[in-house]
From Swiss-Prot:
Designated gene of the protein: LLGL2
Listed result of changing S649A: Decrease of phosphorylation
Description of post-translational modifications: Phosphorylated at Ser-653 by PRKCI. Phosphorylation is enhanced during cell polarization induced by calcium. Phosphorylation may occur during the cell-cell contact-induced cell polarization and may contribute to the segregation of LLGL2 from the PRKCI/aPKC and PARD6B/Par-6 complex.
Phosphoserine found at: S653, S965, S1015
Function: Part of a complex with GPSM2/LGN, PRKCI/aPKC and PARD6B/Par-6, which may ensure the correct organization and orientation of bipolar spindles for normal cell division. This complex plays roles in the initial phase of the establishment of epithelial cell polarity.
The name this protein goes by in its record: LLGL scribble cell polarity complex component 2
Impact upon substituting S653A: Loss of phosphorylation
Similarity section: Belongs to the WD repeat L(2)GL family.
Misc remark: Overexpression of LLGL2 inhibits the tight junction formation.
Subcellular location, principal: cytoplasm
PANTHER family attached to this UniProt entry: LETHAL 2 GIANT LARVAE PROTEIN, LLGL SCRIBBLE CELL POLARITY COMPLEX COMPONENT 2
Amino acid sequence: MRRFLRPGHDPVRERLKRDLFQFNKTVEHGFPHQPSALGYSPSLRILAIGTRSGAIKLYGAPGVEFMGLHQENNAVTQIHLLPGQCQLVTLLDDNSLHLWSLKVKGGASELQEDESFTLRGPPGAAPSATQITVVLPHSSCELLYLGTESGNVFVVQLPAFRALEDRTISSDAVLQRLPEEARHRRVFEMVEALQEHPRDPNQILIGYSRGLVVIWDLQGSRVLYHFLSSQQLENIWWQRDGRLLVSCHSDGSYCQWPVSSEAQQPEPLRSLVPYGPFPCKAITRILWLTTRQGLPFTIFQGGMPRASYGDRHCISVIHDGQQTAFDFTSRVIGFTVLTEADPAATFDDPYALVVLAEEELVVIDLQTAGWPPVQLPYLASLHCSAITCSHHVSNIPLKLWERIIAAGSRQNAHFSTMEWPIDGGTSLTPAPPQRDLLLTGHEDGTVRFWDASGVCLRLLYKLSTVRVFLTDTDPNENFSAQGEDEWPPLRKVGSFDPYSDDPRLGIQKIFLCKYSGYLAVAGTAGQVLVLELNDEAAEQAVEQVEADLLQDQEGYRWKGHERLAARSGPVRFEPGFQPFVLVQCQPPAVVTSLALHSEWRLVAFGTSHGFGLFDHQQRRQVFVKCTLHPSDQLALEGPLSRVKSLKKSLRQSFRRMRRSRVSSRKRHPAGPPGEAQEGSAKAERPGLQNMELAPVQRKIEARSAEDSFTGFVRTLYFADTYLKDSSRHCPSLWAGTNGGTIYAFSLRVPPAERRMDEPVRAEQAKEIQLMHRAPVVGILVLDGHSVPLPEPLEVAHDLSKSPDMQGSHQLLVVSEEQFKVFTLPKVSAKLKLKLTALEGSRVRRVSVAHFGSRRAEDYGEHHLAVLTNLGDIQVVSLPLLKPQVRYSCIRREDVSGIASCVFTKYGQGFYLISPSEFERFSLSTKWLVEPRCLVDSAETKNHRPGNGAGPKKAPSRARNSGTQSDGEEKQPGLVMERALLSDERVLKEIQSTLEGDRGSGNWRSHRAAVGCSLSNGGAE
C-alpha cells in the first residue's frame, strides 16, 4: 500500500478542499420517464405520479416535490392518497401493496416507505384469486378494500396491512343476497370498480366486469341495490349526493342509474353512445360532476369511433351544449378533475382537468370559456422534440433576462391566466442567488430557453429556426384549428410532437453571449445561424454565405445528405431572437464545434472537414481551413457514416487482440489480478475511505493517423494572448482536432471606428501536433496570474477584472488522455497530467468552474471540472494540474448520459437520465441548489385558483449519490436514475435520441455533441 500513498499529505489543504468541494445529486428536471399511474389528494392538493421503473413522484405548489423508489423496481399500476392524510398506497404489477408517508425531519418533509404487503390466497388457489384489480381507501383511513380478478373483495387494515378475513366480501356472498332473477354466475368475473358512498361510509359500490353493480351494506353484510347492464362494465361514477350512478361500458356507451328504494332493479334513466351510431371503442372512465349553475360536466376517456378515430388518445368534456374531445399525441395514462375539496359540499364545481399522458402532463382550465390549457410550472416535457444538445449560461444580466421573458410571454397568449391549481405544501427553498439559463437544442430545429436558476425548470422562450428554410410544413400552420362542423370535435392539446419535418434541422451546437444578446446556433446539415435579440417583430431577408471547407481539395465527393434549402425573400420573425445571417458549410456535414466572440463580432465553426471564421458584422468570410487527412475518406460519406471496410476492421481487431495480450502479460507482475481496476470501485472498507491514493498511470500509446477521423474539429477557442512574440498580444483563434492537432491563427481586428471599413485578417501562426495524437477536447489560455481569460465583454461590464497582460501567458491543452500546459508564445511544454489512472479512461467533457468556499465569502478558486467516459467527475487544479477530488457520477454503461452532460460556471452540472429528464448535480459546497419543502395534513386548502402563476419546484428527498473521495460524504439517496438506468430499453432510447441513426446516407442527425470547448470560462 505504501507506493499508492501520495507524498506530502497536507491537512490544511484537505480541510480547504472540504470547504470547496462536495458532490450532491440534487433534483431531477423534466417529465418522468414512462409514467404508469396517477393519483391526487383533494385535501392536500398533491399530485402523485408512478412510473414503470418503480418510482413515485409527488408534486404540490411550485417548489414542492418528493421522490421515492420501490426496491423491487416493478411498475406502479395504481396510486391512492389517503383522504386527509400525508400517506399514500401504491400497487405494483407484482401484486404488492406499499404504504408511504410524508414525515417531518429537520424541519422538512421526507417521503418514506413504511410497510409493504402481498395479498395471499389459500393454499392451492389460482393466482387470479388474489390478483388485485381495484384499490379503495376507506374514508376512515384505517381500511383498504381490494377488488380482485376472482370477484372477491378483501379487506386490509392500515397501517400494518393486516388482512381481515372475516370482512371479505366474496362473490358467493353477493350472489346469495341477490334476488332470484339476478342470480347468474356469468354476472361476476373480476371487480372493475369500487366506490364509497359520498355521504354514508357504511356503503360501498362494487362493479363487476360482466355488468353487475351492487351497493353493499358493510354493517349488515347485505345488498342494498343492484343494477345489471347488458354491456361489459369498464368503470362507474357515484354522484356527490349519492342519488345517481353513471356507468361506462366497452361498446362506447354510458348509462345513468337512479339510486332509489322504490325500484330494486331499475332501468337506466338514460343510455347514450356519445360518438355513435357506428361502433365505438370502450369508455374506460367517466365522471359526472355537478355545478351550481345546474348543468353538469360529463368527462370521459375513450369512446371514439373505432374505424376512423380508434387510434386517437382522447378525453371528452361535455357541458352546457359545448363538447370537445381533447386529442393527445401520446397514450393517456390517467386523468383527474379538480373539484370542491370539502366532501360535505353540495356541488362538485370542477375547475381544472389534469391529464397524465405517456409523454406529458396537460392541465385544462374548465372555468374559462374555450377551456384553454394552463401553463406548467414544472413537469415540462423537455423531449417534446428530441433533445440534441445543451448549453448553460450562468448569471444572466437582468436586462437580457427581462427581454427573453417578454418575448416568451407573447408566445403564451393561448394559455389560461389561472393560477397553478395544484398548490399543496410549502417550499422552504430560498430564492436563487442569480439567474441561470439552460438552452436545449432539438431535432425539429428549435432552441428552448429554460429558467435553471432554482430547483424548478421553467420554459421561458422557444426559438424556431424552421422559418429560415424551405420545409414540407408551413410554419404558420395551426395544428389546433378545428372546423365548427367537424365531428368528433377534436382539439389537439399538449406540446409533445415526436415527428420532425426534416431531421437536418436538428440543432447540434449553441453559443449565447449574455452581454450582447447575440446567439449562434449550428445544425445537422452544416447550417450556422447568427441571431440577435429584437424586442419587435421584423420582416427581413436572411443573408446567406457559403463556406467551402474543401476548396483546396480535389477528388473528394460528398455522399451524405444535401444542404437545407433556404428562403430567398424576406421572412417575418416574431419578437425574440431573429437570424440575420446564415453560413452554410460545404459539404453540409454536422457542425461539431462552435464559438462566438461578440466583442470582435466573429463566429467560428468546425465540422469533420475543417473549420472557418466568419465576420458577422461585415457579413463576410474571413478564412476556411481544411483539416482532412488523406485517410479521412469516410468523412465524405456523411456525418452519420461510421462503417469501416471489413478488411480494415479485421486488421484493427487483430492488432487490438495482440496489444491486449502483450499488455496483460506485462501487467501481471505489478500486483494481483484486478488491482488496476481498484480505482473505479467504491471504497467499501472504512480504513480506505479517507486515504488519498496516487493514481497508477499507464503508458499512453500513440495513435495512428488512420485510427479515426483526424480532421474532425472538436473544439474552438478565442483568446487575446501572446501568439507571435512576448512583446505584443493579439486576438487569436485556436482549433483542436480529433487527430491531436492544434491550429492557432492570429487575427487582426480593426478598431471600432474602422470596423466596417477594414476587413478582419487572419494568419496561421502555429500548428502543434500532440505526440500521442489523442483528440483535443479543450483549449484554454491563462493570463499572467494563471487565471483563465474572462469572457468577451465581461470586463467591459465590470463583472471581471482585466486579465494580467504583463506576465507570461500559458496554454492549456486538454486531450482525451492528458492535460498539458505550454508557455506562450514559444509553446514549450511546462506541465502535464496523464488522466490514465483507470484503464480505458478518456476525457469526455471539460470546463472551467469557480468554486467558492462555504466558510469564507471572499475566497474561491478556479479549477477544471472533468468528466470521463467511465462516468467519473474529477476536479483538477489550475495551473498546477493537481487532482483535487474524484466522484462517481454517471454509470459507465450510460454512454448517452455521459454524452449529454453539461457543466456550469459555478460547479454544477446536468445530464440526461432518460429522454425526458435531466439530473442536476453539484460539485460545490457553496453553489448548491438544495430543495426543501414541507407538507402538513392539518393545512387543508379549499381556496380556488385565481389568476397568475409563480412556478417553482423542489423535492425533499435526499438525492445524493455516488462516491466522495474527499470532503463530507452524504448517504446516497434513492434517485430515479438508479431505476431508469437499470433498464436497457431506457439506455437504448436515450442513446438513440442523442446519437441518431448512424446508417450511411441517412438524414438522421448525429445528435451526441462530440467534444467540449473551453470558452473563456463559460459553460457549454
